[in-house]
Swiss-Prot record:
Residues 284-295 have a biased composition (Basic and acidic residues). GO terms for cellular component: cytoplasm. HAMAP family: Rel_fac_1 (MF_00093). SMART domains: PCRF. This is Peptide chain release factor 1. The modification N5-methylglutamine is found at Q235. Peptide chain release factor 1 directs the termination of translation in response to the peptide chain termination codons UAG and UAA. The keyword RNA-binding does not apply. InterPro entries: PCRF (IPR005139), Pep_chain_release_fac_I (IPR000352), Pep_chain_release_fac_I_sf (IPR045853), Prokaryotic/Mito_RF (IPR050057), RF-1 (IPR004373). Residues 284-309 are annotated as: Disordered. The gene is prfA. Disulfide bonds: none annotated.
Length: 360
């Protein structure tokens, strides 16, 4: 391992020890903000420090084994020990490289998840509902909380558009690769001839940024409309104009929120989504301007950016970014999507490592 990397790891180890001492001090324990910040930093360093300790232990074991090579009775055992250490050291060094990769500061945040029906009419709306259930079940398995902000239901079931907020630890980091076009191939329930139809939905994932990171929005740049919430009917349908639609005139971004019965609450939620969308749009514009030949596994949420196909007749799901196919469609639609998400994260980390190697 390079001396610069070892030096970096030593400084992280020292910081971890320093934080451990600080967390035991009365002045820190009594200051909740400071205690929370130090605890978070301590937890973030935990994995890399443990991994580095293992690396040091393996190198120490290998040095001890090398001292035994001159002893004929111990030579064979020492050689086996050295080979085993070399193999594990290689694995641990790969882990350390990944742990030292630059972190996306947004990864720890909650996120907004938007699902929109695209081409395919009613069937696209039904598929949007299927995707919403898939993500809801996945969130449930992770003990995350899903909060519906706005839902525009389609006539045959499902949604023309649904926007939700997902709350939990590391939510954006796990879901950010879901942005892009999702295509379904299946026989619709309304199809009498048994023909397979292709429909599509778009998914967009954005971090919920803290207030300090949100852009200042000029009130004169906004058009705010209020209207009555739409719903299936019955006693819970609003009779007041509590639903809110906000248009950001300079960018043309439109956000609707109708989940709360209070117009003020709906407006606050819509403003939060709008701010995140403005930040995301600017980020995508900058990334596009800086784009080089390296592929970008982070989808844009654009309809043309097809990332995944769900083929019902064959029971398969294919991720087109890394040519990954799994034949467990039922499990996937029931929320077991880690086997699709984790390979993308691994591939993304490999791309980051390759980029760092090129810069070195």
């Amino acid at each position: 391992m390079k001396p610069t990397i070892i030096s970096k790891l030593e400084s992280l180890k020292e910081r971890h020890e320093e934080l451990e001492a600080l967390l035991g001090e009365a002045s820190v324990i009594s200051d909740q903000d400071k205690f929370r910040a130090y605890s978070k930093e301590y937890a973030q360093l935990e994995d890399v420090v443990k991994c580095f300790a293992r690396w040091n232990q393996l190198n120490s074991n290998m040095e001890e084994a090398q001292l035994l090579l001159d002893d004929p009775s111990m030579k064979e055992m020492a050689q086996e020990e050295i080979e085993a250490c070399k193999t594990e050291i290689e694995q641990v060094e790969q882990q350390l490289q990944i742990l030292l990769l630059p972190k996306d500061p947004n990864d720890e945040y909650n996120c907004y998840l938007e699902i929109r029906a695209g081409t395919g009419g009613d069937e696209a709306g039904i598929f949007a509902g299927d995707l919403f259930r898939m993500y809801s079940r996945y969130a449930e398995s992770k003990r995350w909380k899903v909060e519906v902000l706005s839902a525009n239901e389609s006539e045959q079931g499902g949604y023309k558009e649904i926007i939700v907020k997902v709350n939990g630890e590391g939510v954006y980091g796990q879901l950010k690769f879901e942005s892009g076009g999702h295509r379904v191939q299946r026989v619709p329930k309304t199809e009498s001839q048994g023909r397979i139809h292709t429909s599509a939905c778009t998914v967009a994932v954005m971090p919920e940024l803290p207030e300090s990171e949100l852009p200042e929005i000029n009130p004169s740049d906004l058009r705010i409309d209020t209207y009555r919430s739409s719903g299936a009917g019955g006693q819970h349908v609003n009779t007041t104009d509590s639903a809110v639609r906000i248009t950001h005139i300079p960018t043309g971004i439109v956000v609707e929120c109708q989940d709360e019965r209070s117009q003020h609450k709906n407006k606050a939620k819509a403003m939060s989504v709008l701010a995140s969308r403005i930040v995301q749009a600017e980020k995508e514009r900058q990334e596009q301007a800086q784009a080089d030949t390296r592929r970008n596994l982070l989808g844009s949420g654009d309809r043309s950016d097809k990332i995944r196909t769900y083929n019902y007749p064959q029971g398969r799901v294919t991720d087109h970014r890394i040519n990954l196919t799994v034949y467990r469609l039922d499990e996937v639609m029931n929320g077991k999507i880690d086997e699709l998400i984790q390979p993308i994260i691994t591939e993304y980390q490999a791309d980051q490592l390759a980029a760092l190697s090129e810069q070195a």
